[in-house]
């Protein structure tokens, strides 16, 4: 599993201009089975995406994110080997 951290490089009003397209991109990731969960960081300085699959596939998807294409955010990818979970979250292991 990977945790993607987005850090905004622009003011939130600029982020908001690209938010609808970013949300559509997230939906594509969910439909593909790559994205498991996502949300905004608090305070609103960026976001996080929990993702399954390979790092190369994920990096290719990030290149297509409207936030990336339009210079809205920087990204880091951390790989995590989940070894234990609460009931119902076994999909995160591996």
Model regions and ranges:
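Conserved, structured core segments of small domains
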Residues: 1-94
């Amino acid at each position: 599993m990977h945790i993607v951290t987005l850090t905004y490089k622009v003011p939130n009003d600029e982020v908001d201009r690209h938010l609808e397209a970013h949300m559509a991109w997230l939906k594509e990731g969910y439909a593909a089975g790559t994205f498991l969960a996502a949300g905004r960081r608090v305070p609103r300085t960026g976001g996080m995406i929990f993702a399954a699959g390979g790092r190369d596939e994920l990096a290719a998807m990030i290149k297509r994110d409207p936030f990336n294409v339009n210079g809205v955010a920087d990204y880091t990818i951390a790989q995590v080997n989940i070894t234990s979970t609460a009931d119902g979250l076994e999909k995160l292991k591996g």
